[in-house]
């Protein structure tokens, strides 16, 4: 049987819908990665600003006094190095996550919304930290001021460094959670793809199978007349067999069993005796009496 236009349209619409969904997901992923690159650049600028402020503070002190009396700058150098190392690790994890998402563009959109919210939160934190650093630079730290202002500036920078470290740690945790969710969504997407492929195959097979004509179905289904005829034949055969069986029993064994037990239970005593009185002349008559004279 030839395919109808509706079946052809359904078959053509399935791959077109899949292509449109893939394009939408790739566009959303591209926008997400653009925002991610913006956050990377903001973080790099923030690190540069922190290093610049640290350099200004270190230059204001004498080298001997810094090594002997103020060990906070050494700790600050170590913290900045740790910060840069963690930043590099975060960038590596984000690049790996980017490659994973490019390989599987059919991940769920809910994961992308959570990533966008996280990036917006981090951008706000970065902008606030950068604003505080700009305020420190605008103050114009003078080299002739006392040690109290320098200690306060160092404490502020140290607090800023703590905030940046905490935000980076939160970023690492969130990236790990998002990667785990991404893997889970990838597994679910593979399962749904397998089920959808099976369903589409079944639908295609159903559309391709020719429909049986109505005349063929009518021929296979038996007409009601034949059903009634079969039932009537069975009833007649059963009736004939029962009557012949009773007649054979009466002929060879006698009618006492029928009149004393069977009919007595079915009809009652009075009707049974009346029936016997009606049939008694025929039972006692001889064959010669029935013959014509």
Curated annotation (Swiss-Prot):
Q: Please indicate which superkingdom the organism of origin belongs to.
A: Eukaryota
What the entry lists under PANTHER family is as follows: SINGLE-PASS MEMBRANE AND COILED-COIL DOMAIN-CONTAINING PROTEIN 2, TRANSMEMBRANE AND COILED-COIL DOMAIN-CONTAINING PROTEIN 5B-RELATED
Protein's name according to its UniProt entry = Single-pass membrane and coiled-coil domain-containing protein 2
Annotated disulfide bonds: none
GO cellular-component terms in the record? membrane
Transmembrane regions: 234-254
Keywords of this protein's UniProt record, alphabetized? Coiled coil, Membrane, Transmembrane, Transmembrane helix
Q: Report the main location listed first in the record.
A: membrane
Q: Which InterPro entries match?
A: SMCO2/5
Q: Which residues form a coiled coil?
A: 116-188
**What membrane topology term does the record carry?**
Single-pass membrane protein
Cellular localisation: Membrane
């Amino acid at each position: 049987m030839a395919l109808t236009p509706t079946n052809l349209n359904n078959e053509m619409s399935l791959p077109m819908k899949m292509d449109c969904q893939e394009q939408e997901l790739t566009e959303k992923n591209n926008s997400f990665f653009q925002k991610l690159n913006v956050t990377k650049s903001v973080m790099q600028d923030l690190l540069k600003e922190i290093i610049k402020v640290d350099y200004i503070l270190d230059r204001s002190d004498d080298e001997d006094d810094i090594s002997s009396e103020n060990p906070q700058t050494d700790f600050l150098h170590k913290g900045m190095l740790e910060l840069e190392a963690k930043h590099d690790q975060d960038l590596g994890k984000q690049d790996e996550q980017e490659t994973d998402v490019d390989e599987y563009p059919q991940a769920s959109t809910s994961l992308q919304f959570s990533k966008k919210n996280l990036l917006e939160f981090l951008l706000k934190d970065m902008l606030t930290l950068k604003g505080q650093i700009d305020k420190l630079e605008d103050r114009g730290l003078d080299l002739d001021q006392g040690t109290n202002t320098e200690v306060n500036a160092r404490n502020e920078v140290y607090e800023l460094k703590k905030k940046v470290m905490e935000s980076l740690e939160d970023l690492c945790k969130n990236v790990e959670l998002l990667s785990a969710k991404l893997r889970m969504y990838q597994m679910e997407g593979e399962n749904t793809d397998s089920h959808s492929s099976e369903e589409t195959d079944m639908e295609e097979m159903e559309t391709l199978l020719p429909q049986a004509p109505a005349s063929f179905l009518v021929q296979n289904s038996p007409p009601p007349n034949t059903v009634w005829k079969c039932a009537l034949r069975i009833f007649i055969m059963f009736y004939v067999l029962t009557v012949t069986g009773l007649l054979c029993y009466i002929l060879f064994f006698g009618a006492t069993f029928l009149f004393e037990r069977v009919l007595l239970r079915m009809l009652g005593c009075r009707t049974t005796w009346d029936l016997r009185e009606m049939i008694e002349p025929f039972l006692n008559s001889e064959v010669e009496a029935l013959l014509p004279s």
